[in-house]
Amino acid sequence: MNDKLNFKIVGSGPTGLLLSIALSKFDCNIFLTDLLTKDRLIDKDKTYAITHSTRKILSKFRLWEKLEPFLFGFDTLSISDSVTSAFTNLSTSDLDDDISSAENIGWVVKHSDLMNVFFQEIDNYENIFFMTPQRLLRKKILFDYQFFSTGANSLDKKFIDFVDIKKSYSQSCLTFKVSLRGHCEK
């Protein structure tokens, strides 16, 4: 292990796991660590909407086909604003030309299914190691690079004066609750 670069990833949610899978393509050792156990990381009551841009990324790492059995696609999306009473309906005909033949606008996946697929994938790599912070500390590994995937306002980054690189976009993102109505196919 001494002749390879050592990467440490703090935070083993979807971002940390996907980062470890991406870095695993290089000749390096990747040490994933989190305060939560694997079971606790998987067992969260969350759901994600997957867009076509995310689908493309997952496909590059051969994860899309592994996730497909757990995805629920939707071909129309109704967006309404309860304050202004405005609404709009989107369908597959509203997709960009490069993905206009797609049957779905997007997909929904449970957090636990996504995490199970990601953890199963990292188990296939001999250069990715998932450890508790205490066990990792006892190994006394000198890390060449450290990544924190513990959230935007993580205390981890603030405590160790970590360089936090952010990119501002001229777009905004809204978080909202979704009500799923109608026929849902797998």
Predicted regions mapped to residue ranges:
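Extreme N-terminal starter segment of soluble prokaryotic enzymes
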Residues: 2-8
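Glycine-rich Rossmann-fold phosphate-binding loop(s) that bind the pyrophosphate
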Residues: 12-14
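Flavin-dependent oxidoreductases
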Residues: 172-186
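N-terminal FAD cofactor-binding segment of flavoenzymes
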Residues: 43-84
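Redox-cofactor binding/interface segments in oxidoreductases and associated redox assembly factors
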Residues: 10, 148-149, 176
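Short alpha-helical segment within the catalytic ATP-binding CA
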Residues: 18
